[in-house]
Amino acid sequence: FTLLLPVPDDAFTRSFDGIVGGAFAFLAMYLMPRDPRKNPRARAQALMDAFAKVFQLSSEAIRYYDYNKAYQSLLDARALQPLYDACRGDLITAQGMNELSWNSRKSKGELARMAKTLAAVDLAIRNDRVLNRRMASTIHHVQLRTAAQLSLSDALTELSVAAQSLGLGMSAPTEGEREHYMMEARERMIKLAGTLEPRTMGVATFEGESLVLMLRLIVVDFMEATGMSHKDAVAVLVPLGEAVTKHAPRTSAIPIVDADMDDSTVVD
């Protein structure tokens, strides 16, 4: 019989084994690629489902003027950031895997579209945190009219439904389904954008007006998430009328502070 001599276990041998193993792994990934869209789709759906629940809780908080629910909605809104970061991370990984795949054209467009949608959703999440913080403060310190409570609640409910549609628009398996849900969210937001005017919504306090303004920002973010340009999204917003509160600041009076002076001057 033949006795084989043991292979010396030196650094070169281990490096060679690693190179060979990596080459075979790369070849297997290239020839039999896994669908890179699976994880980002699931993450996007989970993110938007959680976002929809935040809007729904906010809707209940302002409708029933419940500070505890408003504060909880703020905490839940803050908890969206880790979900977004995980979704964004999976998307970046998926795009990298897709570049190494021989049939990358199949997934490239969908992943690029998802990246644009997530960028707009990120802005909406940030604006929603501000909205919920202001809403909790408003409920704690100011009593809004019943009409204002109901109209704000209805708007938040619409955002909740739109968030669910956006989630389906990113996670549905076919292009036709994704387009359907994106258009559904867009049409809902365009309709809502035409109603977000303080006077129309029964708002008569400065605090209530600030909530309406924040809603307008989130609606624009969601319209951009469906693929609309920023210019087109802003264009469908109902124009704002004059301030309805007596104590609202005049936007034409801008205080300018000179660094070398103690007093400030107001320029009209």
Task: Please annotate each region the language model reported.
Residues 113-268:
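Soluble C-terminal extramembrane regulatory/interaction domains of multi-pass membrane proteins
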Residues 1-76:
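A transmembrane helix-and-boundary motif of multi-pass membrane transporters/channels
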Residues 27-28, 87, 124:
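Hydrophobic residues within the alpha-helical transmembrane core of Major Facilitator Superfamily
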Residues 78-92:
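Short, charge-rich amphipathic alpha-helical segments embedded
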Residues 35, 39-42, 61, 68, ...:
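Primarily heptad-repeat coiled-coil rod domains in cytosolic scaffolding/tethering proteins
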Residues 32-34, 92-110, 139-142:
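Conserved catalytic-core motifs characterized by acidic clusters
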